[in-house]
Amino acid sequence: MKEHFSIAIDGPGGAGKSTLAKAVAKKLNILHVDTGAIYRTIGYAAFSRGLDAKDESQIAPLLKEIQIDMAFDETGGQKMLLDGKDVSTEIRLPEISMYASNVSALPCVRAYLLEMQRDIARRRSVIMDGRDIGTVVLPDADLKIYLTASAEE
């Protein structure tokens, strides 16, 4: 029997991936990793330094300068830490969304975070939600869900 298992939830923005993942994680008492929050943290780092989030020549060096960590509270809530500071609120600001979207398209960022996300899944049972989770990040996940929702729902 495997020591750890992984669940991957893919789907478009606004489909309810995080809502479902949080509920399942709570029910199964496993870790929920919101991968979008990790990208938002890099976007926030770029924003706060005045960098062009579309310019890989600016973002690649940033990845070597910053320290990104995750902490989880007693309820399993994910906190994002940037250089030791909790930035969980800041990364949800509307102006950070575009930065997060832009940095997430950069190959250097995707490669940087890919290993981080896979390492988490190697060490613990997890449910991860985000785009490309079941195809790229956790292609061998024990359970893969592609979640969609209509505009009416």
Model-derived features with residue positions:
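Post-Walker A helix-loop "phosphate-sensing" segment adjacent to the P-loop in P-loop NTPases
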Residues: 25-34, 48-52
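Hydrophobic anchor at the beta1->P-loop junction of P-loop NTPases
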Residues: 7-9
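Conserved phosphate-donor/acceptor-positioning beta-strand/loop module used by diverse small-molecule
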Residues: 139-153
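P-loop (Walker A) phosphate-binding loop of NTP-binding proteins
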Residues: 12
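Hydrophobic positions on the alpha1 helix immediately C-terminal to the Walker A/P-loop
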Residues: 20
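Conserved glycine(s) of the Walker
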Residues: 16
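ATP-dependent small-molecule kinase phosphotransfer cores
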Residues: 37-125, 135-137, 152-153
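Phosphate-binding P-loop
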Residues: 1-4
